[in-house]
């Protein structure tokens, strides 16, 4: 497959990597058009403003169709020299759309395919202590369902490792962004130089699927877990997400910026969640093998209440909260989370 005839690029979806690639393509003199969704358009970019505002400030044309399969602007703009590349787009493409691109409709996948299919990739990876990252350009076929299933051939791929300092999703996002933009530059360099890309099948025997998550509904802390598992779980729902949830005196609170210490432990199971020390380094809560040192406690509305926490209080999650979290199935559409 050669792509050196491409002059126009449709970017579909959202995220910082899409924005970075759009800017890169503009410097290479490509015609760039972005097709996004309401939830993607509201995403905050590295500069602190929304994707929509960033695109406007860069003079990059963008559209927000309900369904690209029936959108006249999308359909009428496709030419034999148009390439499409998705970044978490919300649409599934029909056979007619795929044929219009003549094999040049792709998806960018920032995961080590076929592992971590689904959603909430970094949360799942943090829970499993996985530091393997990857970038893939994958052919979109009619069987692809965004966030559920993909089987198209791999056009171009690279693997990398997340640094040992990466602890929370924000760390993974930041590290991945640099790798992804560099990967896409290399992809375009090779395409412009006339490389004949070889399509490779996805090795399905290694497939792993983990579903999308809803932090508020599913990120509830089970204080019976080991100290390490508590740390991993709370880190996995840290920035840019709302934080892992529990209760304090019957009120919902969310924890962030945690670390563990073993100097004071272990603790009896009856002691888990008890706040036994508060000082300038954090709120110390007992857990089975040691201390969970919490750097930030937020109320349900996101206000920092760390300074109000006192010794003798207990973080506790009722069983009904835990059962609801384990049985909830997160679903998203173009507007955001479905309730």
Regions found by a protein language model. Give the residues of each.
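Short amphipathic alpha-helix with an adjacent loop that forms part of the alpha/beta core around
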Residues: 69-80
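Donor/substrate-binding cores of folate-linked one-carbon enzymes
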Residues: 8, 24, 88-208
């Amino acid at each position: 497959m050669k792509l050196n005839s491409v002059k126009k690029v449709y970017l579909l979806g959202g995220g910082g990597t899409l924005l970075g690639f759009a800017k890169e393509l503009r410097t290479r003199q490509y015609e760039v058009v972005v097709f996004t969704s309401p939830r993607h358009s509201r995403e905050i970019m590295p500069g602190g403003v929304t994707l929509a505002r960033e695109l406007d400030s860069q003079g990059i044309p963008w559209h927000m169709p309900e369904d690209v399969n029936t959108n006249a602007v999308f359909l009428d703009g496709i030419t034999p020299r148009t390439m499409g590349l998705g970044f978490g787009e919300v649409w599934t493409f029909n056979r007619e759309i795929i044929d219009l691109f003549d094999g040049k409709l792709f998806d960018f996948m920032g995961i080590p395919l076929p592992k971590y299919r689904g959603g909430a990739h970094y949360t799942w990876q943090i829970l499993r202590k996985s530091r393997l990252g990857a970038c893939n350009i994958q052919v979109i076929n009619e069987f692809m369902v965004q966030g559920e299933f993909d089987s198209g051939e791999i056009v171009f791929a690279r693997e990398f490792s997340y640094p040992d300092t990466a602890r929370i999703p924000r760390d993974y996002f930041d590290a991945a962004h640099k790798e992804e933009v560099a990967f896409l530059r290399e992809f375009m360099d090779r395409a412009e130089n006339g490389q004949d890309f070889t399509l490779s099948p996805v090795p399905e025997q290694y497939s792993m699927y983990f579903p999308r998550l809803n932090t508020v509904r599913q990120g509830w802390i089970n204080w019976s877990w080991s100290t390490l598992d508590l740390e991993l779980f709370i880190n996995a729902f840290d920035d840019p997400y709302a934080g892992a949830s529990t209760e304090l005196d019957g009120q919902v609170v969310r924890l962030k910026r945690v670390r563990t210490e073993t100097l004071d432990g272990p603790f009896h199971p009856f002691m888990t969640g008890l706040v036994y020390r508060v000082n300038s380094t954090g709120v110390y809560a007992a857990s089975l093998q040691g201390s969970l040192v919490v750097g930030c406690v937020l109320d349900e509305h996101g206000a920092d209440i760390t300074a109000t926490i006192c010794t003798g209080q207990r973080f506790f999650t009722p069983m009904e909260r835990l059962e609801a979290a384990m049985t909830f199935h997160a679903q998203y559409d173009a507007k955001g989370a479905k309730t």
